[in-house]
Amino acid sequence: MTSAAAVRSPGRRRAAVWTTLGVIVALVILFFIFAGLYADILWYQQFGFLSVLTTQWFAAIAMFFVGFLGMALPLWVVIQLAYRLRPVYAKLNSQLDRYQQVIEPLRRLAMYGIPIVFGIFAGVSAASRWQTAAMWINGTPYGKTDPLFHLDIGFYLFALPFYRSAVGFASAVVLISLLATLATCYLYGSIRLSGREVRIARAARVQISVIAAVYLLLQGVSVWLDRYATVTDANVNNMINGAAYTDVSATIPGQAVLAVAAVFVALLFAVTAFTGRWRFPVVGTALLIVAALVIGAIYPWAIQRFQVEPSQKTLETPYIQDSIEATRDAYGLSDIDVVPYNATTSAEAGALRQDAQTTAQIRIMDPAVISPSFQQLQQFRQYYSFPRNLNVDRYTLNGSQQDAVVSVRELNQSGLTSRSWYNDTVVYTHGYGMVAAYGNQRSSDGQPVFMEYGIPTQGTFGAYEPRVYFGQQSPTYSIVGAQKSAKSIELDYPGGDNDAQQTYTTFSGDGGPKLDNIFNRLVYALKFQDEQIVLSTAVNKDSQILYDRDPIKRVKKAAPYLTMDSQAYPAVIDGRIKWVVDGYTTSNQFPYSHVGSLSDAIADTETPKSAYAFDDINYIRNSVKATVDAYDGSVTLYAWDAKDPVLKTWQKIFPSTIKPISAMSAQLLQHVRYPSDLFKVQRSVLGQYHVTDAGSFYSRDDAWTTPNDPTSSPTDPTLQPPYYLTMQMPGQKAPTFSLYTTFIPQAASDSSRSILKGYLAVDADAGSTKGKVAPGYGKLRLLSLPSSDTIPGPGQVQNNFNSDPTVSQELNLLRQGKTDVTNGNLLTLPVGGGLLYVQPVYVKSTGETSYPILQKVLVAFGDKIAFEDTLDQALDSLFGGDSGATAGDNNVPATPGGSGGGSSGDAGSSAGGGSSGGGGSSAGGSSSGSGSSGTQSNAALQRALQQAKQALSDREAALKAGDWAAYGAADSRLQQALQAAIAAEGR
């Protein structure tokens, strides 16, 4: 007995050990899960949007239980009924006996386990669709009806998706219940197979018949709902979206017939529960399947093939017209002003006199090119950086509005020479200051002219909080804050030689969860997998942890229902640097509206195309404007489109999270702009839907597209992005800050694609009155060029620039040396009664610390071009010696007064002979240039160019002959000639 106990004791001990280990592992896993959830609560609580998190959690939990119970309970009931109503003395074959012997010990586990497992899967699926249920419960009427069923569009946006989802879920529950019933009845003898004979017990017959009847009823409801879904489906060879002739004449009536037939067959199954005769429901089911094939597929195909296709244009016209009107409504294009524009191509003297204000604001600083200039002139230390693409905004200076290229000096820890947890987390925590350059000016050596610059900040913006704790390049997390008596350890900004006079600061805002107890520190140590959060003495009771610092991500967390614009831009507003972010409400359920991929629509040179995006939409509104404070990360949401029914619905779900427009300050409105992503979507749709006549739309003989960016790679072309400019469109009383794009024909022929067909601009200025949006904001104006006009498009203009003998000679010579030539954005402006093209040309040396300088400006009007050192000179050259207007670079300032900044490293390396930091020698600015008839250059420049040409020829000849000594001598002469040419230009 003792021996047996000894044998059992190790087994019990091992079981106890394994049980203990299992419990410990489970507790650790649960604690990790809890830590993540608790960290979210702390973050949202400090963020001020805890209700957003809890609403999502409660809604998902509620939907989980609905899904769990909706699946598990019916499944458990049918299994229990099938088992309890089994025939007690049924004669089973040997095979079923073996099955029962295997299953019986696990019967109780299976009867509860199977419903629970299926219930969990169903609950998870239902929880993921909480938004669909919430939108159905809180749906808002749209105020318009669809043209076919005459139901409010809100039914399609909010109710129909939920109804179809609910019916689909119920159908899955009933189908799984039917399969479970059949399996249980078979295992326990309620269904017996004897040769060709199938015997079904009465109780099983009733249960199976009722479940089958319910399933067919649900299929009838599903088919009935499918009728309404036809108005949101693609049709007519994807030409339009929504029900077309075949749908209205065949598919929808056929679906109604099938729905009624399904109900009839369901009644036959219900009758069978009492009569026991399976012949009628089985025959009815077979006929239903045949009817589905004939009525649901063959008949619509025949109508389409033999009736519609021979007369498609005539029969589809009313439905195409419905699609045109719905699409323009859904994408905000209903109120667009279309103006015929008979553009002249004659560049006459004084042609720009009536457009003097627009001409003065033409931007020559390309935000996609001059980031290295900001980097070298305003970086100051390697641990600061600027984004690759800068932003365009406007500021009111001395009573007038001025376009500016702006950015913030963000922290870039990859530039630190000494990396450690202490430095990365508690010392280098934030960027510093705004940097802004005039969009229409340049210094004498081609550098940007800064209106706000330096560390500490100086310029025209006045006093504001310059520290950037929340930005697009901020570290993953930083720990900030300390007691008032403690010494500051956060580096604020450098100063003096070798950083001998560095300034330190302590974060004093409320920007992140507090680390005032060991539990919070442990939670975040687990979240970021970093034990130093617990161990470091730099963390104190006043410390805060800042994370999730990207402005777009923060707005997305505050409003998870929004689709975010791809760009956030900084502005100095009410004494703070704030990021302005645009949010959209979207849907793909708008009746008859064109469906397109959002990612495809916004892809261009500035926004790369997403390879795996699933973001088809057919409705979009810029419903929310948001700001993110760069110092403390606080987010404020404003209902920009308060009439949007989708936004109204979400406001019911998340009440008190969005402020009205009346709460927006005057300074904030001054920096609000029309969002570029929305404009890109609208232009992609307008390429086809500018045609409002259904017949013309069907023939697609006037379809447009956005031209490729002339500055993109020929091997991988991308669309030209829209550009922000202050300009006066034909019909406007004064210039406004606008966003524009151009259109060319959508055709396979290269010759036809080069012609400009349309010019779309939107008023992007929201005004400067507190709580009131300017009446013109968002007004779309389309200049439609006559088909007989042959105005060159951006691609053809770029070809003209490149093929001009004088222009190409000078630029090609520059490219042969140790310099790179970069063409800036090719701008198009409707001025002078025609279309003016402006393109800045930048030159930079090939050194690592070089940066682009503005060397020349190319302009074109009609077939004439000019190539000068400044825009003002180029316009005068283009328009017969006097354009009638003055550009912003007519009085080029001296560099010390214009650049206003230093640099890190050899910032002054340039192709123009070198400029150093905030000052330097001139790199252009002479009056030499070329019109369409050639360049009027000084003798020194011509001589230097001839010498360079000869040296290049000699070098090529030496290369072919294999004479390396002669090759080296010729190359040396080429470099000397190029430097002489640049020096001659600078005089």
Curated annotation (Swiss-Prot):
It is found in: Cell membrane. Residues 897-932 have a biased composition (Gly residues). It holds the Pfam family UPF0182. It is a multi-pass membrane protein. Residues 700-719, 886-947 are annotated as: Disordered. The keyword Transmembrane applies. It comes from the Bacteria. The keyword Transmembrane helix applies. Residues 705-719, 933-947 have a biased composition (Low complexity). Keywords: Cell membrane, Membrane, Transmembrane, Transmembrane helix. The chain crosses the membrane at residues 17-37, 59-79, 108-128, 167-187, 206-226, 256-276, 283-303. One of its GO terms (cellular component) is extracellular region. HAMAP family: UPF0182. Belongs to the UPF0182 family. This is UPF0182 protein Lxx09300. It comes from Leifsonia xyli subsp. xyli (strain CTCB07).
